[in-house]
Amino acid sequence: MKKLFFLCLGLTATAATTAPVEGWLHMRGPLQTGVSLEKRLQDKIQIEDALWTVDLPGRSTPTVANGRIFIVGHLGEGADLQEGVFCLDADTGEKLWEHKFNDFLSDIIYTRYASSSPTIDPETGNLFYQGTQGLFASFTPDGKMLWQHSLMEALGRMTFPNGRTATPVVDRDLVITRGIMANWGSQGPPWDRFYGFDKKTGELVWAAKPGGRPKDSCFSSPALGWLDGKRVFYATTGDGSVVCANARTGEAIWQVPLFKAGINASV
C-alpha cells in the first residue's frame, strides 16, 4: 500500500533572495550538528493547526532556506516511477519548481529505509542532491541545474533497494558524499568510498576509502567536526567501523571496528 508523506509547516518566511542564507540547511540542522538554534518552540504540534499541507510520498527530511522548502520525493509506480527534487513556498505551500528523474531501478521500495535529503550551501544557497538512481547534482535556489554526475556511470556507485542513499555535507568549498562503489582501476574493487567535489563546478577533488572492505551496504551521512585544528568528518562504514577522516582529503585519521556488518546509523 502506498504511503503518503504529509508535509505540514507553519513558518514565517522571508524573501528567497534575502542574504545571508538562513534556515534549516541540512538534515542535521543549520550547522550540520544535530542542534537547533531556535528558542521557545511549541511543545506539541497538531495537524489541525497546520497553515497548509502538501501530499508528497517520500522519506526525505525537508530543508529550509530564505522562505523556501526543499524536499526529495517520488511519483508514479513501476516503469513510471520518478524521483524528484521539489521546492515549495514556505508561507503558502505553493510548488515553485521541481526536477524529476526516472528511477530505472524497479526494486526501489521508498517506504522502508531513508532516502537522501537535500543539502543547502550556507554561502551560495545552492542545493545538493544525491538520488537513488545515482544522480548527484547541484541546483540554484531558483531551480537551475548547475552541474550533475551519474555516479553509477562515472564512479561505479552500487545501488540497493529501499532508497539507501547518504545525504551530502558541505565544508567550505567542498561538498562531500559517499556510497559503495565498484569500478575499474583506482575505483575498484568494491569499497565504501567518500568523495569531495568542488561545490561550484562539480569537479572531483578527492576520493578516499577510510574504512575497510564493506560487508554490507552503508548509507549513513558524514558528520563534520574539528580535531586538533583540522576539519574532519565522522562516519560509519560498510565494514562495521566508525571512522574519523580529514574533510579536505578524505584520508583516515582513525578507525574503530565495532560490528561484523555494515553500520547504517549516522554518527
Language model regions located:
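Sec-dependent N-terminal signal peptides
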Residues: 3-12
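Noncatalytic, solvent-exposed loop/strand surfaces
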Residues: 16-267
